[in-house]
Amino acid sequence: MTYQAPDENGFYGKFGGRFVPETLMKAVIELDEAYRASKTDSAFQKELNYYLKEYVGRETPLYFAEQLTAHAGGAKIYLKREDLNHTGAHKINNTIGQALLARQMGKHKVVAETGAGQHGVATATVAALFNMECTIFMGEEDVKRQSLNVFRMELLGAKVVSVKAGSRTLKDAVNEALRFWVANVEDTHYIMGSVLGPHPFPEIVRDYQSVIGIEARKQHMEKEGKLPEAIVACVGGGSNAMGLFYPFVDDSSVQMHGVEAAGHGLETEFHAATISKGEIGILHGAMMDVLQDENGQILEAFSISAGLDYPGIGPEHSFFRDLGRAEYHSVTDDEAVEAFQLLCRTEGIIPALESSHAISYAVKLASKMRPEESMVVCLSGRGDKDVNQLKERLEEQAND
């Protein structure tokens, strides 16, 4: 059976949809129409591919991690090197596409939210490239954690607004960015950073990120003469995972594994494991699994990795879970830090803390598989942004 989702109302099973105030409905429908038109517009697609190749540096390598494989002692581990993109992560695959879409709609201003700062940097980058005015909302906590990325965004010409409401993290930044969009909808496009939000955002972001899986599928066939037995990616909102998963969705022999942030542990309140611990609710314009208390109040998500501490998850991931098409697991802060150090030492690659969650689970999974089997892990970003945070953490532990 060929997988087809979302339906015409933007639902993935019972998840997704379009729950937005009347003030945004026109903009969301306009975006939907522009997006559908762009898919069959050969000039648009040609320009998108030009920038992905010449500016972003695609395609990215599928790298056989020989030493990591030997360490795990099982299946071959291939890394899809999204860390080698311009700006150092997968985020730019999506921002390039959406900036071109904004231009097509005649909008010369963009707004975005950011957690780790990677999406903010990728948005500020394309805004500079296409000469657009750019406003980025970032939770005050994340501004502190990722001060280097704040400076990067400002260097690129963006205005960074520190959000002091609520938990002062990603969820609150999204709230403020949506408010800003409502007030400036005529000339501003909202560049959603993950497979979240009202329809058509989850579909748009999935499609722009699918370049990851399309390339990985082709590259793995060239290297191994077969499809991988498993594919693994970290999941916050879930765009790098969806980008890897979607092109494999009809290949039933390929197991799909999403890895959430377990923070201090699932038994504590300090985690971001939405699929494991969430319940269905509406957040930021879509029906999805959400971390919430018994009164339906959104809980704060927690992770060492600023890019994973979102209290919801892309609706299509929840749908994959319900279909049994993908499995979701979680990895603690400590396990992610261990995997971060392991990849540095075995392969000479400094991964983002987000991606380190995927590496941690991949090593466990590979050890249970046979040597003739193989897997693809999405190395979603590089870890330069995390080195300082890690240094402080390890120094604290040494002093305890």
Curated annotation (Swiss-Prot):
Keywords: Amino-acid biosynthesis, Aromatic amino acid biosynthesis, Lyase, Pyridoxal phosphate, Tryptophan biosynthesis. Its cofactor is pyridoxal 5'-phosphate. Coiled coil: none annotated. The modification N6-(pyridoxal phosphate)lysine is found at residue 91. Its EC number is 4.2.1.20. It holds the Pfam family PALP. Pathway: Amino-acid biosynthesis; L-tryptophan biosynthesis; L-tryptophan from chorismate: step 5/5. One of its GO terms (molecular function) is tryptophan synthase activity. GO terms for cellular component: cytoplasm. It is an enzyme of class 4 (lyase). It catalyses: (1S,2R)-1-C-(indol-3-yl)glycerol 3-phosphate + L-serine = D-glyceraldehyde 3-phosphate + L-tryptophan + H2O. Tetramer of two alpha and two beta chains. The beta subunit is responsible for the synthesis of L-tryptophan from indole and L-serine. Belongs to the TrpB family. This is Tryptophan synthase beta chain. It comes from Listeria welshimeri serovar 6b (strain ATCC 35897 / DSM 20650 / CCUG 15529 / CIP 8149 / NCTC 11857 / SLCC 5334 / V8).
